[in-house]
Amino acid sequence: MMKKYTNFVAIDVETTGLNDDSEIIEVGLAIVEDGAVVRTWQSLVRPEKPIPKDIAIMTGISNEMVADAPAWSEIEDEFLQVIDGHWLLAHNYLFDKGRVEFQLGRSLPNDWLDSHDMAKLFLPTLSSYKLVSIATHLHIPDTNHHRALNDAVVCAQVFLKLMDDAKQLDPFVLHEMAVTYNGQQESLFANSSCSLGDLLFRLAEAATASAPALDSLDFFEPSYADPYEMPRLRFANAEAFFAQDGILAKMKPDFQYRAPQVDMLDCIKQAFATDKHALIEAGTGTGKSFAYLVPALLWSFEHDARVVIATGTINLQEQLFHTDLPFLKEALGHPFATAIAKGRSNYLCLRRFSEYCRRASTASERERVFATSLVLWHAQDHSGDREHLNLNKAENQYWQNIASAPDTCLGRRCPFYNECCYFNSKRQCEQARVVITNHSLLFQDLKIGSLLPEYDRVIIDEAHHLEDEATHQFTDTVDFELMQKLLNNFSRNGGFLGRVTVALGKADTLAENSTEIAERANRAMTDTVDAAKTIGGTITFANNIPELSNIGDLRITDKIRNSGWWLTLEESLRKSHRAVTTAVTSIRRLLNSLDEDENIESLLREMTHAHDRLAEQRDWLERFIAGIDDSFVYWAKTYKNFSYANLLLNAAYIDIMPLVHEKLFEAKKTAILTSATLAVNKDLNYTANKFLLEPGEYLSSINESPFDYEHHSLIAIPNDHKDYSKTSDFEYTRNVISDLKALIPAVDGDMLVLFTSYAMLNKVQQALKDEPSLNGYRILAHGQDGSRSSLLEALQDGEKTVLLGANSFWEGVDVKGASLRTVVIAKLPFTPPTMPVESARNDLLKSQGKNAFTANSLPQAVLRFRQGCGRLIRSNSDRGCIIILDNRVLTKSYGRTFLDSLPKQPVWTDSVATLADKLKKWHNEP
């Protein structure tokens, strides 16, 4: 029965682009018989339009190569003969199918299967589903990526390997996958054509029972520490772990003693022993993670006390838990009790997932693949943690249907309670003595409690983000899209009201209440939309949002509240508030009237949660309208292509630090704040003052990077442009373009250019792509050419690349070696003073008689600048240059603050042309 799936043709096409009218420039076919590639067919194709530069760079197919190639019409008949009578395989088949049928001018009768979908199903945790990534994972050679014949052969080999591996899975799991995908039984597919659904049933038939059955697997396997097994070290002599002849040296052949690492550990030891807080800057290469994990583990064991470690990013959280902690447990000779804590929505709800699988067959093809892939994932990984999955944008939306959520949770009454992924995670955290979490969950716990187990010592890594995260977590946001969704659930027959009526069979009893609630919910929806449109239109007009701007923010100041036009906005908001209040009251009355019938227990929880969220939105809207709390800044936010659905009304603390000090530093015995960038001009006073820390309550330590910056790095600053303050945005952008055109060939690519705005980034990319002298370089842009991770992969794939990045690219980019040899700072990263929170904080500082620029704007920019420059040297062997195109570091009195905050290294200042010559020679030095 499997034979028909071992005879097929794999196809790949290279094209002039990704648009609907893109032309094929190469086609490759791999003919498979009895599970082996028996012959191939390939041809270049001459397109009617020229091949774009970026396509030529990616594929290696130039206009010269296809000049004498046949047109599609000349190879069409032979192509059709080769594929005749076969089903076709491609990677992301809709693209190849679409391009071929576009060239043919008609549809093909052949069945199609997708190797991408097969990989999604059987490799659900793969980090990338590019063909080359799948091939690498399966140990299949891929010698000429982005050439059609090579990719067709690799595609065939990937499919065959996945099919062979699938046969070794538990037949029960395969059968569950088939039923989830199809929603039908095998007999209906006995004579079907080739399809993914049919293939799943055939694989279940052919599978051997080599894996344990799904229901025999343990869902919860906590890691308990043996209390009688002592670690190899005591807390008091933890620094011995890093000694020249210590434990780490014996376990790592490339070990190098780092004095800054030991200094950092000593500071943490003192803070723990004396119940003090600490501010610790640890430069790149210090070994920061081990420096705080070792004392945390030993302290938690010896004192039977919990230590929480919070990171700014999920990536670091995962690294600590899945890489660093297992290594240290082995090194220290003790299975310390550790756990990872994440937000509830990160975990799979088994009850919702079970229901989702039963109805998945009626969903779209993409959603069916998603649901089916999770059947295998959960059979192999019972943590239910979505971080182990690689979800795209659409799949993230699907996940919301199966994620653990308070509004749908039945608690102990749930039939899956004992296996619950979320509660198992909570139980592990309660048993653990070292808990790894993230800033977001840390502050949610500080705000509402009960999310993390009790603790009195915390280590916060990536602490330069702490103020922003605290501000975000304590911001109240009126979300008009959310209000519409909540109201919509009560406004239609298919929503909550209809489901209650069906479940209880009390149509007559509920009819009157249902009609009243539906009418009031509809009225609230109408009034809310009207209010959103009124405010959104005003913001757009007031800010005159530029064509390339993404966000429009309007700070609602006292001056605006006293203006005539505000009265119109306020009345519109009040009308919406009254309508929502009326709807909330009616919903509450209905909830009070419903008995706790077990038939609607889950539904009642959903309705109650929706009511509570709607009431919360109503209360926040009331606060926003009143605007009487001077400790808050109020603003409205909308996005490009405004609609009522993307309007947000926000209220945030102007100065969040008193609350942070109360919730964190006053409540905990020890809070360690660490980062590569806490100091300004090699001084921690700015950070200490920001967090309201008094000299006697904290320790401090600045641990410089052990890397040799003086010999491996330099700073280049062009000095042949006008003073920045005398330059328009248009002229400055033109200067950046001109400078990059000269500098990119000089350093031969391998460059990251950091921007503070997408508007400038987009203009620069277009100009560089149009520059003939840069034809040999791939110019990629954040927001234009793929996700952050895919762009970083491209930077390291060996091609000469210039990556233009904004926002997130200023930090967290860890590219070692020759793939990144130049970092360019296009503009100093000052936060725009018109941003609502920044504006309000500056106003507060001015009212206190302080200089807002030196007290706030400058130090924040310096820390951001240091983060950006820190992308360059990531290892002892790295070598490269930092180019600063913003001449304010030379012309302004505060410019030295930026330069003096960097590690000591040569600084070159000259014309762009001269710098280009010097950098070319320097890069070519051994």
Model-derived features with residue positions:
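Acidic two-metal-ion nuclease catalytic site recognized across multiple nuclease folds
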Residues: M2-K3, L160-A240
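A contiguous, basic/glycine-rich beta-loop/short-helix subdomain that forms a polymer-engagement track
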Residues: Q400-R433, H439, L446-G449, H577-H721, ...
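Conserved RecA-like P-loop NTPase helicase motor core
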Residues: P718-E731, G783-L890
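Signature of the SF2 helicase/ATPase Hel1-core->accessory helical subdomain module
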Residues: Y292, L298, E318, P326, ...
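Conserved pre-motif I regulatory segment
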Residues: R232-L279
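Conserved non-catalytic scaffold segment of RNase H-like nuclease domains
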Residues: M2-W112, P124-H146
